[in-house]
Amino acid sequence: LLGSFSASTAMAEELYSLDTTCRTGNRSFPCGVVATNVDDTTEYRHRFGSQTVSYRVIDEPFVRIEGRASNTKPWSSVKNATINFNTQELCFNNEAFCVKNPSFLADVLINSGDAMQGRTKAGMVFGSNGRVDVACFDNGCDRLLEAIKQ
């Protein structure tokens, strides 16, 4: 068991860390983010006080995002994710948790090529299997949120 643990630990590569602001609802607070490649996923650990909230992006066999409220909790699919490029904020599950992460958003813009250039907002709603069901951009995200609330 220890040998397999060591092997998986060796596969982790820290990409960056930053001190930033996180938010739950209307309450903002300082937090630290560590982004790490772990095997075939990229994990983002958000630390504030004695708490850690983590999200991971999995690309294969399809893009999905999972989160967990602490290191002892299991991973579960997020319901939705939104990006506001103007405020440099990424939010999950109807803004239950948000983080200002300009490093991640710069990567999104670079890796998306022309598709995201000039965009102010992007959003995704995930199905029960974690796969993207609906994607929106700019005013379409506002319209989608209005439709969901009705």
Feature-to-residue mapping (PLM):
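Bacterial N-terminal signal peptides
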Residues: 1-4
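N-terminal signal peptide c-region/cleavage motif recognized by signal peptidases
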Residues: 7-9
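Cysteine-centric segments in proteins
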Residues: 12-150
